[in-house]
Amino acid sequence: MANISEISGDSNDGGDPNKKPEEQVLRRSRRIATRNENQNKKPKEEEEKDNRSVSFPIPNELTEACVALIRKCDYPSLSSVSSYFFNLIASSELYETRSRLGLSETFLYAAIRFPDTNPPNWYILHRNKVSSLRLSKLESLPPVPYGCSVVTIGQEMYVIGGLLDVRRLQLMTLIDCRTHKCRSLPKMKRGRYHAAAGVFDGKIYVIGGFRMRKPDAEWIEVFDLKKQIWESLPGPYPKTSMDSQFFAHAVMEDKLYILGSRCLIYEPKRNGEWDATVNANPIWNLWKVPCTMQCVIDDMLYTIDPQCTLGHPIVVYNPKDKTWRPVKGESLRTLPSYFVSDGSEMANFGGKLVILGSNGSCYDTGDCIGEKGIWCVMIELEKREGGEIWGKVESLDCVLGDINFLSVWLCQTLTL
């Protein structure tokens, strides 16, 4: 960005009435080129200092405070104005300011597959100019590999493994959710598909993802975020299961809960112990195939029970007392079927429960109303005496409409 003084007319170029216009333009162009050439010869540190002072003369602290007040959905437009704003929006200091001012926002990232596309693409759930929730495609991000595992750390998502054609990927990709740019990280030693993953003490643990577990396989790999290297853990591995492709996984109370044909509980902070009583744990009573959608809110596992075993379609598991409870509420009893069946996805949206579901199949039976597409229900949760959890539908919106037979593959949320 140039100062006003640099844009004003030059009396030496434009003040001689005897010169032809072509000569004036040519002479000014030469002067500008010479000036730019001289500027390019400055030391890098001096050039960067000049650019900072010229690009935006307002103090950085004041600019940062002003930008923090702007909604995150407007940041992409602002970042395209100049490199100064792009770097500001990509900085961790800006989001620390937003958090300090109580302006942090929760964003949901979903992998959405269209009938004629393969594989799914990344979409972000946000509020538009009129405060309606909408899903918008993130054009800058690559497609989402089938069967990948995703973990979130701060303002970043890590996409691990997956399937390309019939090949299991060793890749791990980091997505910076501030700028929606991505980069590749060091590869795993083994390709993985439908692996379990969790973050503990600055390390990403990845378990399984093979067709079958073998004694000499790197069944567990650990990525050190600080050193940026992968290491294999030799074991001991649980003797109760030879599974290596999992349906779902969740982290609660520093434990990694893994759902397969048999179920596992892994504790990295206790020297990699496996829970020996896992098959007697009541968590497997309602968290099971085929409806494996789940999310963790306040260290409790929420999932769907299509059979309404406890009288309600949404249930919650508390690992402290190892009990299942229904999420009660009259408005939850009347949720459309596509929210409480296999094919939907749920996530922790800033302490609220959000479920995405496609109503395309309902139109075939004629029992669906509203616009066809992907719908989002936002449920406010309330803890009551006796450990009861109650839910109330806060909003119900079509967030990606006029398209039939969309499918939701996964959901992740971050606070920015």
Curated annotation (Swiss-Prot):
Keywords: Kelch repeat, Repeat. It comes from the Eukaryota. Residues 1-11 have a biased composition (Polar residues). Residues 16-26, 38-52 have a biased composition (Basic and acidic residues). Residues 1-55 are annotated as: Disordered. Pfam families: Kelch_FKB95 (PF25210). InterPro entries: F-box/kelch-repeat_ARATH, Kelch-typ_b-propeller, Kelch_1. Gene3D superfamilies: Kelch-type beta propeller (2.120.10.80). Kelch repeats lie at residues 156-202, 203-250, 255-293, 294-344. This is Kelch repeat-containing protein At1g19460.
